[in-house]
Amino acid sequence: MDKVKKAVLAFSGGLDTSVILKWLQDTYQCEVVTFTADIGQGEEIEPARAKALQFGIKEIFIEDLREEFVRDYVFPMFRANTVYEGEYLLGTSIARPLIAKRQVEIAQQTGADAVSHGATGKGNDQVRFELGYYALQPDIRVIAPWREWDLTSREKLLAYAEKQGIPIEMKKKQGSPYSMDANLLHISYEGRALEDPAVEAEESMWRWTISPEAAPNEPEYLDLEYERGDIVALNGEKLSPAAVLTKLNQLGGKHGIGRLDLVENRYVGMKSRGCYETPGGTIMLRAHRAIESITLDREVAHLKDDLMPRYAALIYNGYWWSPERKLLQVLIDESQAHVNGQVRVKLYKGNVMVVGRDSRTDSLFDPTIATFEEDGGAYHQADAAGFIKLNALRMRIAKALRRH
């Protein structure tokens, strides 16, 4: 085993990463730097400092990355109306590039020669983290404990923790019956009962959203203001990116919006069932498509729709830092130059309904041409005859010459 001098660990303070921290110290006899990111997971992160200190850690990094996460990752992704396999809003996928970037930066800052993460050898996160590491620092050493050790179950982790004197709160021991991941964009649930895709998830599982059946009987209207494809104000109040998403999560959760139960194709080859709550993101997606509907040129909109699945797959599979994702981002961002205006949506029992959209500066909707009433000569209907004949020409020729 090659000697490791110092490793930067993505550290939550929970069971898995606490065991990893001790395992790194014992197995590699190396100094460990802990990095804990607040990306809106909704848990107190300062206890991670106390936990790291118990392990004798001298260099501890705890950072509030919520604004950077939404501004530089979530918002750029939503400019593309990004959805993986028709449903998934990529809440887990989009958080990994930022964490990987900060780990590499901290490694460079502290002189560490390795980075480590707590992703298992079965999932997508190991790929997402490590593609990011290598893209940002090609010679970095990566330590993935789940691919090395023999602690293959939660019970074995708990036994190791007890043997090594690793403090784990009883509530952590009992935990949730599901494997969960949360950030400001979503919360996900996997494992246990969900491993049978035919079984409905229990109502008690959902944490962010009320059941649509129990949601308020009165709808709620929201006005969202856009500049260059990003939301800058909600109901007339200017808000930062993280504040926008936080507020939309609260409002969407109140009305039972954003629940999703799906089976997805993982990059590593298997199918996996997951349940997700993305209330704010669901509202953002619907509203963004609405403002684009009146501000984007038709062919630009269609080209974006054609490219979106490829862009979504790049993010899902961990290629955020790849040249092809960056190239697509330039195109996407350029398309948003005129995506300015307002959208009104109605929230009601799990539904997001667009009820209005307007752009005083950039709308391409011309009512004098689109009207069903007298248009005063703005549109000459007779012009359509030649347009139709030219578009039918190839089909007319084929039918005339082939006769079968």
Swiss-Prot record:
Binding site for ATP: A10, F11, S12, G13, G14, L15, D16, T17, S18, A37, G118
Name the UniProt record assigns to this protein: Argininosuccinate synthase
EC number(s) on file: 6.3.4.5
Gene Ontology biological process terms in this record: argininosuccinate metabolic process; L-arginine biosynthetic process; urea cycle
GO cellular component, as recorded: cytoplasm
The keyword Glycoprotein is annotated on this UniProt entry: no
Enzyme class: ligase
Keywords, sorted A to Z: Amino-acid biosynthesis, Arginine biosynthesis, ATP-binding, Cytoplasm, Ligase, Nucleotide-binding
Catalyzed reactions: L-citrulline + L-aspartate + ATP = 2-(N(omega)-L-arginino)succinate + AMP + diphosphate + H(+)
